[in-house]
A protein has these predicted regions:
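C-terminal single-pass membrane-anchor helix
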Residues: 213-316, 320
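Solvent-exposed, acidic/flexible segments
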Residues: 32, 110-111
Length: 320
């Protein structure tokens, strides 16, 4: 959806790409910056030069982890999603109070809590502007968000109470922090241009690149249906974020329903073919049992009549 939101009323097509990096190959901001440079170069090569390249692409990155949180009213462990770029443009989670954190924030000490964590620390959700500690370091609460309520996201998110914080801030708390998910929306002047740029220039390693803009197309659903049973085998060392697991769950259901639809659509055709074959078979039997013998008999009778006439004509003229 981010691709369509970013496109707006423009005639230019946009494509949404997700890159999932193995946990033992996670990358830093320097590689993101290098990819952005290559991305801009590729856009220029495609004759898409404009004054402000940021209008041709938008990106976000994230990683997950665990932190200890505390306030004057409570403490505990929480799941953290450390984010950078325009993360909440890609994932517009509903705000209950306060505001999102963005890359434009001068200070990287603002965090977003989910409802469960807000109730643990302060017994409510209207807590924007209050302070808390993460691993002993003071942070300011920017707001509270509501977790997605659809059945797929609810099933996919299993980390319990959690928070969102800036990737920069998280990197200061955790020495081995690294980006494991990179998301991109960019101009796609020709089919697979954006996907090709990502495959060519992004440091994906053994990870996986997903083209989200066409992931629910009919052809892809049929392909996924053929992969039933092996699709769930993950051998690349990638830990998908919960939103990707939710999307893959939706894909599985769509692939199954597509297969059912194809089978249902094919049944009348198959039935008609079977009936046609049976009719032809019966027609052949009738032809062999009735029509052909009669035709042979009539032919033989016609031959006998002609032979008799010839004989009569010959012997009759002799007698005269």
């Amino acid at each position: 959806k981010e691709a369509s939101r970013w496109r707006g009323e423009s005639d230019m097509e946009f494509s949404q790409i997700s890159c999932f990096i193995p946990v033992d190959e996670k990358i830093g901001l320097e590689k993101v910056a290098a990819f952005r440079t290559k991305l801009t170069e590729e856009l220029h090569k495609a004759a898409l030069d404009i004054d402000n390249d940021s209008t041709l692409f938008v990106d976000a990155w994230s990683c997950t982890g665990k932190v200890n949180v505390s306030s004057d009213n409570g403490k505990g462990e929480a799941a953290v999603i450390a984010v950078g770029g325009e993360f909440f443009d890609f994932h517009p989670i509903r705000l209950i109070s306060g505001s999102y954190i963005t890359q434009r924030d001068l200070m990287k000490d603002r965090v977003l809590l989910d409802e469960d964590l807000a109730w643990l620390l302060y017994g409510g959700t209207d807590i924007a502007g209050l302070s808390m500690k993460i691993n002993g370091v003071p942070y300011m609460i920017a707001g509270v968000v509501e977790r997605e309520q659809d059945q797929f996201s609810t099933a996919a998110y299993t980390s319990g109470r959690g928070l969102y914080m800036s990737y920069d801030g998280y990197s200061q708390l955790v020495e081995d922090a690294g980006i494991t998910c990179y998301e991109l929306v960019m101009a796609n002047p020709v089919k697979d241009f954006a996907l090709g740029v990502a495959k060519k220039s992004f440091p994906i390693g053994r990870g996986e690149i997903v083209e989200n803009s066409r992931r629910f197309e009919f052809g892809r659903m049929l392909k996924l249906a053929k992969q039933f049973g092996s699709r769930s085998m993950q051998t690349m060392g990638v830990i998908y974020p919960y939103w990707e697991n939710a999307a893959r769950s939706v894909e599985d259901w769509c692939a199954l329903l597509t297969l059912v639809a194809v089978v249902c659509a094919a049944l009348p055709i198959i039935t008609a073919l079977v009936l046609l074959i049976r009719m032809l078979a019966r027609g052949k039997e009738k032809l062999e049992d009735d029509v052909v013998p009669k035709l042979v008999e009539n032919t033989q009778e016609a031959i006998r009549v002609r032979q008799r006439r010839r004989w009569e004509k010959k012997h009759g003229s002799h007698e005269k």
